[in-house]
Amino acid sequence: MDRPGFVAALVAGGVAGVSVDLILFPLDTIKTRLQSPQGFSKAGGFHGIYAGVPSAAIGSFPNAAAFFITYEYVKWFLHADSSSYLTPMKHMLAASAGEVVACLIRVPSEVVKQRAQVSASTRTFQIFSNILYEEGIQGLYRGYKSTVLREIPFSLVQFPLWESLKALWSWRQDHVVDSWQSAVCGAFAGGFAAAVTTPLDVAKTRITLAKAGSSTADGNVLSVLHGVWRSQGLAGLFAGVFPRMAAISLGGFIFLGAYDRTHSLLLEVGRKSP
């Protein structure tokens, strides 16, 4: 990948990430509180809906930028084989690699954010300090495995579906999709991926919010899912599915649309620059 492409992916990914995380933060808070062990009301209900937003604001740009740099680089690296039937597989591999890298940044931000969302009266920096004091760096990476196990299946569904919908729309209208059309494809892809991966999101939330030293905090996703199934059934496994779908559908519209638009503009500026 050349330097203009690298810079375009870096900036476009970061801009898209910040836009989505800040605009849709209230929906994310509602989803987290619905999935929390203490239940929606005890976790804060609709009070302090922006609790934890500083953590999201700090982490969103580098997280999204890291994802898209990796995603675009792996797509470029695999481009040597132009077989069209392998294209979805390339997108899956690129998205999976992007998630593994991005989660190194996302998880600490997410841990602090989610604990703030269910403890609205506690300041974000205090939560960050408490985690470091009580659990060390390991505490900030609580749920890394469960986050990766959530994000990779999500990306395996979302990104190939997004790319396929764009390709189909481009073929139908005989020219490359516009930014708004890319955003619509992103909304459909994101909403569908969000729905089918909600149980993994529930497990990840429970692990992140668990008390240090508890069995849930160990991070065994299957064990957590089994526990939720036994205590709450299917409703527990899909807790927060509608706000999650709404947030990620809107997020897909904004995120992927903003990414495509910003990426195209930056590449165009790069071509015009001497």
UniProtKB/Swiss-Prot annotation:
It catalyses: S-adenosyl-L-homocysteine(out) + S-adenosyl-L-methionine(in) = S-adenosyl-L-homocysteine(in) + S-adenosyl-L-methionine(out). Strongly inhibited by tannic acid and Bromocresol Purple. Changing residue 199 to L: In COXPD28; loss of S-adenosyl-L-methionine/S-adenosyl-L-homocysteine antiporter activity. GO terms for biological process: macromolecule methylation; mitochondrial S-adenosyl-L-methionine transmembrane transport; monoatomic ion transport; S-adenosyl-L-methionine transport. Coiled coil: none annotated. The chain crosses the membrane at residues 5-25, 49-69, 85-105, 142-162, 182-202, 238-258. It is a multi-pass membrane protein. Solcar repeats lie at residues 4-77, 86-168, 177-265. Changing residue 148 to G: In COXPD28; decreased S-adenosyl-L-methionine/S-adenosyl-L-homocysteine antiporter activity. It holds the Pfam family Mito_carr. It is found in: Mitochondrion inner membrane. It comes from the Eukaryota. The keyword Repressor does not apply. The keyword Mitochondrion applies. GO terms for cellular component: mitochondrial inner membrane; mitochondrion. GO terms for molecular function: S-adenosyl-L-methionine transmembrane transporter activity; S-adenosyl-L-methionine:S-adenosyl-L-homocysteine antiporter activity. Keywords: Antiport, Disease variant, Membrane, Mitochondrion, Mitochondrion inner membrane, Primary mitochondrial disease, Repeat, S-adenosyl-L-methionine, Transmembrane, Transmembrane helix, Transport. Widely expressed. Highly expressed in testis, with moderate expression in brain, heart, kidney, lung, skeletal muscle, pancreas, small intestine and liver, and low expression in spleen. Mitochondrial S-adenosyl-L-methionine/S-adenosyl-L-homocysteine antiporter. Mediates the exchange of cytosolic S-adenosyl-L-methionine, the predominant methyl-group donor for macromolecule methylation processes, for mitochondrial S-adenosylhomocysteine(SAH), a by-product of methylation reactions. Belongs to the mitochondrial carrier (TC 2.A.29) family. It is linked to Combined oxidative phosphorylation deficiency 28: An autosomal recessive mitochondrial disorder characterized by decreased activities of respiratory chain enzymes, and variable clinical manifestations. Clinical features include episodic metabolic decompensation beginning in infancy, mild muscle weakness, cardiorespiratory insufficiency, developmental delay, or even death. This is Mitochondrial S-adenosylmethionine carrier protein. It comes from Homo sapiens (Human).
